[in-house]
Amino acid sequence: MFLINVLTVTLPILLAVAFLTLVERKALGYMQLRKGPNVVGPYGLLQPIADAIKLFTKEPVYPQTSSKFLFTIAPILALTLALTVWAPLPMPYPLINLNLSLLFILAMSSLMVYSILWSGWASNSKYALMGALRAVAQTISYEVSMTTIILSMVLMNGSFTLTAFATTQEHLWLIFPMWPLMMMWFTSTLAETNRAPFDLTEGESELVSGFNVEYSAGPFALFFMAEYANIIMMNALTVILFMGTSCNPQMPEISTINFVVKTMILTICFLWVRASYPRFRYDQLMYLLWKNFLPLTLALCMWHISILISLACIPPQA
């Protein structure tokens, strides 16, 4: 029974990932005044299936001097972790109801660094290694601000449990009183998922596509799927934390539709940012976090602690 539950969560995610690639190509196409994919199937709707068949039927090429085991296991680890993070997300009911679901998500997203690092090191290419080191530095740096923001959210929520956020936000979404944190959180999720304008790991001109330069066919597709699964997951988490997914026990499907629509809107914002902004310079990326985001998030965290103490109020207890 548990296996069926797992499949009913993972298969729709993989399907959503496939069609998100099509949505991205279509959105970028229309923003650049062109059509995007429109040959395979009606309006190009079968393009993801054609891409999947092409990628998984090609022979993967292994560099002669690479570490075969790590080279193969890194993309598998990336996709496994990307799908595991979905387990505690309430949609409106989670696959596994953890008491410390926010900590679990942070731990899993930290582990994703290893798949990037292994892939860069195992390729035995200086470009791949430099791209991997950039990705690791960027991911670890932005996790600092994300953790501080989550701490502020937990102070308002009174619990690390994600299902408790729906109760907290029954009357008012947390995006309104905590909009500076929401802005910084959204920017941090862009950096955490290595998306434009923070896609420094894939610098085509200086790093020849970064840590996955040696990957092709199936293993490359696994990295690609992991990246897009992380994008949808981060947006789903943003909706849960800031945009209140209140669950009606009589009609849970209504809250699921509500949740999905909000997640789609945020995901399209991710694509819109990619179409609009140029890539950051590496020093600007680090300056933004360590000089701007970190002091501001720490100050807001202290502010939220002092509000609770000074007003002698406690958040809703789960």
Curated annotation (Swiss-Prot):
EC number: 7.1.1.2
GO molecular function: NADH dehydrogenase (ubiquinone) activity
Enzyme class at the top of the EC tree: translocase
Primary localization: mitochondrion
Key word Membrane present: yes
Entry keywords, A to Z: Electron transport, Extinct organism protein, Membrane, Mitochondrion, Mitochondrion inner membrane, NAD, Respiratory chain, Translocase, Transmembrane, Transmembrane helix, Transport, Ubiquinone
Similarity-based family: Belongs to the complex I subunit 1 family.
Task performed by this protein: Core subunit of the mitochondrial membrane respiratory chain NADH dehydrogenase (Complex I) that is believed to belong to the minimal assembly required for catalysis. Complex I functions in the transfer of electrons from NADH to the respiratory chain. The immediate electron acceptor for the enzyme is believed to be ubiquinone.
Protein name from the UniProt record: NADH-ubiquinone oxidoreductase chain 1
Designated gene of the protein: MT-ND1
